[in-house]
Swiss-Prot record:
The keyword Iron applies. Belongs to the glutarate hydroxylase family. Keywords: Dioxygenase, Iron, Metal-binding, Oxidoreductase. Fe cation binds at residues 160, 162, 292. Disulfide bonds: none annotated. This is Glutarate 2-hydroxylase. One of its GO terms (biological process) is L-lysine catabolic process. Its EC number is 1.14.11.64. Binds 1 Fe(2+) ion per subunit. Pfam families: CsiD. Pathway: Amino-acid degradation. Acts as an alpha-ketoglutarate-dependent dioxygenase catalyzing hydroxylation of glutarate (GA) to L-2-hydroxyglutarate (L2HG). Functions in a L-lysine degradation pathway that proceeds via cadaverine, glutarate and L-2-hydroxyglutarate.
Amino acid sequence: MNALTAVQNNAVDSDQDYSGFTLIPSAQSPRLLELTFTEQTTKQFLEQVAEWPVQALEYKSFLRFRVGKILDDLCANQLQPLLLKTLLNRAEGALLINAVGVDDVKQADEMVKLATAVAHLIGRSNFDAMSGQYYARFVVKNVDNSDSYLRQPHRVMELHNDGTYVEEITDYVLMMKIDEQNMQGGNSLLLHLDDWEHLDHYFRHPMARRPMRFAAPPSKNVSKDVFHPVFDVDQQGRPVMRYIDQFVQPKDFEEGVWLSELSDAIEISKGILSVPVPVGKFLLINNLFWLHGRDRFTPHPDLRRELMRQRGYFAYATHHYQTHQ
């Protein structure tokens, strides 16, 4: 098995015409595609979902799929297959999504509706214990006293996968920028597993398949530890990861040293992408073969960034991990 997968240069068909949105490769990598909903599509979508406040989407989970169908219908039913094809394609698996005209914090509810529609065209977003909803909104400020690196602005949040400390499978992660004030820096950091120079070394190490304990801090509202290996394989035998440096709890010297070396090898990778995400845009990535993090911010007394996340599972046939369910 070859752990590395070449990028397909023709992954995006430049001659393809889509209804309601455009699709182009990003400036950072052909693996990351930029999808932009047209002004007309955005306007029509927001008009058609205006009758449902965000609270309705929280209380009635089937409405999340309803708004997804509305968006897909406005795109001539080309959106859903395109999203699934991209996210399941090992050579891509990541989208930066934008809706023309949705770019102000005053439109925060509209942003949640749009992101919810997109997410529920590919699967379903899991319950987020930190917020008590299917999504979480949180703020990064200049001073932080929380119990994880999620809100700490003046340091790099290291690359990781989401869903490492919960039992639910986390196939996708959606990260949306709702507001930003007095900000410099803080780009999203992404690393595709197949662009990581040290993948083969760590994937083939005996420690790679050893179940390890993952435990979350109190702010996550998750009290039960979970056990799983850092690496697994998909149905085609390709490496996937469930890893975060903050929450893995090595049981002994051997595990601790290996995890420390693994973390260093990830952070020095030349394959890391630095991606600016303006207000109103969101990243949607395959969580099994993309790692994500955040660069540091320049200090400012009035620094503020508000983010929204959703993470969940793909709703299609058989998938997930091959060996460790």
